[in-house]
Amino acid sequence: MKAVKTGVLVLVAVVVVTLLTLRVTGLEPPYVDPASQEFAKSGRTTRPGLWLTGEVVHEPVTNWDWVNKVNDPIRKNTIMLETRTWYGIPHSVTINIVGRGDKLYVQGSERDFRLQKPFPYSKAWWTNVERDPRVRMKIGGKIYEMTLVLIRDRAEVAQLQRGRDPVTKEVGPDGQEHITQVTHWWRVYQRNVPEYGNGSAAAAPEKTTSQ
């Protein structure tokens, strides 16, 4: 019994030391090309990362168009997003980002087996953001502390997508229309910068019509 307790204590100590180390060094999510066979075979998902590290930006950004030109040699035009979990260890992923002048957006889509679950439970980071919208983004090697607000008005999402409906439907073998993909957009607000405060006030005006 004593040996078991000792083994458990050693295991706990190793886990704690590992987490403390990763808290300092960070652990980024791996990048897999969405167009690759590897991504398709993995169920269109990859292993998440943990903490993101880098210089934190405290200055307000008034024009986000530059994010559309991000072209990382590995991650291409994607960025990393760190979300808060209920158990305290971050969950970070690779996502798409869109800048439209002074407005910033992130987007994500669900298809195949993910459509079997109600939003936001088909993706872990969606669930995390729904519970706590405070996130950290790594763009160009720097950390931006943000607040995400889901755009619930599908007409507004269609406008952001240049007129494309966020709900994609196709006719199946049974001759009936079936939903094959649903795309969601979030408005992104900076927080923890002197001009904007913590970002909570900026999130208030967003529309709340049904998704």
Residue ranges: model-predicted function:
Residues 73, 89-91, 98-99, 130, ...:
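Extracellular/periplasmic catalytic domains that process cell-envelope and extracellular macromolecules
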